[in-house]
């Protein structure tokens, strides 16, 4: 594990300790991302309100440490497999939206945070006949999916 990964893991542990949550934190290096897996009793606290606390924690980690990574990967913070499930749900929704775009023209998805937008763009890129574009000036942007 690299120094930046250790620092990111330590930050997550410190934030959880400050919230008085005794949870386990494991940093896993994968080809796509550096995953910070949180587990243990009480993890549901991070998943309330559609995982907003988990999203915020992921944004903080990426803002603080992503630029120190030697490649273009980012950090993915997951708790009790919640993010993994939501990611697959978003991929399925993107594929469905791509099919609609093929039949009836450009389709919008959003507003989406940067992590979700990246996932949508990567899913669309799997089909060479389709393209995607983010529009908007705010943190949450809309993704337009259309045929090339």
Regions found by a protein language model. Give the residues of each.
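RNA-contacting regions in translation and RNA-metabolism proteins
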Residues: 1-148
């Amino acid at each position: 594990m690299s120094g930046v990964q250790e620092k990111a893991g330590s930050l997550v542990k410190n934030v959880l300790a400050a919230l008085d949550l005794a949870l386990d934190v494991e940093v896993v290096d994968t080809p796509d991302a550096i995953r910070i897996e949180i587990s243990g009793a009480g993890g549901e606290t991070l998943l309330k309100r559609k995982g907003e606390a988990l999203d915020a924690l992921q944004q903080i980690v990426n803002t603080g440490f992503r630029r120190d990574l030697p490649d273009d990967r980012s950090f993915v913070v997951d708790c009790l497999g919640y993010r993994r499930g939501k990611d697959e749900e978003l991929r399925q929704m993107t594929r469905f939206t791509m099919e609609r775009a093929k039949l009836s023209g450009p389709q919008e998805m959003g507003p989406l945070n940067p992590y979700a937008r990246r996932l949508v763009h990567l899913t669309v890129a799997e089909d060479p006949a389709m393209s995607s574009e983010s529009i908007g000036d705010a943190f949450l942007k809309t993704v337009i999916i259309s045929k090339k």
